[in-house]
Amino acid sequence: MITILIVDDEKLERRGIRFLLKREGDFQILEAANGKDALGILASNHVDILFSDVKMPYMNGLELTKAVREDHPEMEIVIFSGYNDFSYAREALRYGVVDYVLKPVDPNEFHKTFQRVMENISSKEEKQKQQNRKEDYLKKYFFLRYLYSGKEEDFVQLEKLTDETEDDVSQFSRMVLVSASNCLLYTSPSPRD
């Protein structure tokens, strides 16, 4: 489930954003009254999307965005502001926010912004799935090459792609050989012997 954090010092504004989010779908929604509280929530919760006001006590939205980018570069961020000040918008864009929305928030504009955020998340998830498939393919490829050839360079490639140690790979190799009891396989000694 997507987790969203709304950060605004005005409770009424947080309720308004929560209402608009409920129209978009079912999400886990967290709230904070300022940037400092938001960092505390982020330290103990995985958050996918951050909606933040600019002007808040203790830590403003731009300071929060900068801090979030350092620890959570993948997070989608939308900034809300009652100030039509280009310098705020420019700084927000420099930190990679998806959008800078002026208050009062127009529901249609919010919907378009939210759709863009969800498209970004879907795109990142799809890229991660593709990357995982490629890594799985390469692991299998180099493992089979190592099993058939016993060459050290194939083993080195396999080690680079996996977190497993040489002992783990050797144990798995023996398991494959045992399961292939009907086949005659030749294995060379470990490349490190």
Question: Where do the model's predicted regions map?
Answer:
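Extreme N-terminal starter segment of soluble prokaryotic enzymes
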Residues: 1-3
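Conserved sequence signature across two-component system core domains
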Residues: 7-8, 32, 50, 187
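Two-component/phosphorelay signaling modules centered on CheY-like receiver
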Residues: 11-30
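Short hydrophobic/Thr-rich beta-strand motif most characteristic of the beta2 strand and flanking loop
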Residues: 26-33, 41, 89
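Conserved Asp/Asn-Gly motif in the active-site loop of CheY-like receiver
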Residues: 32-36, 191
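CheY-like receiver
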Residues: 39-134
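Interdomain helical linkers/hinges and coiled-coil/dimerization scaffolds
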Residues: 105-188
